[in-house]
């Protein structure tokens, strides 16, 4: 229902307009206060790159963060990552991730990013505290990438990157809750790069698509072509589950059942195993896998995806960030 409201298919969005006006007024006032320096943002001693979005829901932001970190690492840049840690609750903040950190403590995305990249990752509701924690333990870090946080103006930033779902884009264009917007589309004029996940990019936007890899067994790490798996049950606890199910079908998989889960939903063995009958194979997102690895069965697999950016602009963006980081 919420997707239909946000897309404008359902007329119910009009009933929510008063709340959206209030949301827009408050969020606009907050940004204006920082712009006019009525409130002061904290500036890190190293460059900060924000990878965020204008809308609620999944846009492919985390794969972009992973791509960015890996690309900078390949260029010899030491990168740290900070996040709010949605879906997790640590005993105290800031929390610097380690090999023992769970998704219950740090949230899904930070654990995924840490496991994929090996970069220092810290979470805190106050992102400046997360930055300080990384720099205290890793003083050689040259640049910070923040996963989400475009609207977290308490942390000053040097580069802003926005990721857009190229198919859904901005729906009916209204602020939450009548629409999906955290900020209006005009905010794109002030950011440094716009990356469009799927769909047809517009002038000045960087095209991106998510390239699926081989399926990975959660228990053994064995890899195979996902199309070789039989009697598949697919689950996805991400911002936009239909995207994952569509990816599976694009890979030649016809799931016997698709189960969308809430983003950041906590998972346990009993609930997940109940979704699969004897003889079936469970396939999930990598984000779900970081929550299930500790109690996975032999027939549980995940499908990793990598961001693939096209055109000349990604190289220019990376050159800009490398230059920024090298100056510190």
From Swiss-Prot:
Residue stretches spanning the membrane:
none
Q: Does the record bear ATP-binding in its keywords? A: yes
Q: What is its EC number?
A: 2.7.1.130
- Respond yes or no to whether keyword Kinase is given for this record: yes
Q: Under the GO molecular function aspect, what terms does this record hold?
A: ATP binding; tetraacyldisaccharide 4'-kinase activity
Top-rank lineage group of the source organism = Bacteria
Q: Which reaction does it catalyse?
A: a lipid A disaccharide + ATP = a lipid IVA + ADP + H(+)
Sorted alphabetically, the keyword list is:
ATP-binding, Kinase, Lipid A biosynthesis, Lipid biosynthesis, Lipid metabolism, Nucleotide-binding, Transferase
Q: Provide the binding site for ATP.
A: 55-62
Q: Where is the signal peptide?
A: none
Describe which pathway this protein belongs to, using the record's wording: Glycolipid biosynthesis; lipid IV(A) biosynthesis; lipid IV(A) from (3R)-3-hydroxytetradecanoyl-[acyl-carrier-protein] and UDP-N-acetyl-alpha-D-glucosamine: step 6/6
GO BP, one annotated term: lipid A biosynthetic process
* GO CC field: plasma membrane
The UniProt entry, under InterPro entries, shows:
LpxK, P-loop_NTPase
- PANTHER family membership: TETRAACYLDISACCHARIDE 4'-KINASE, TETRAACYLDISACCHARIDE 4'-KINASE, MITOCHONDRIAL-RELATED
Q: Which family does it belong to?
A: Belongs to the LpxK family.
Protein name, per record: Tetraacyldisaccharide 4'-kinase
Originating species? Escherichia coli O127:H6 (strain E2348/69 / EPEC)
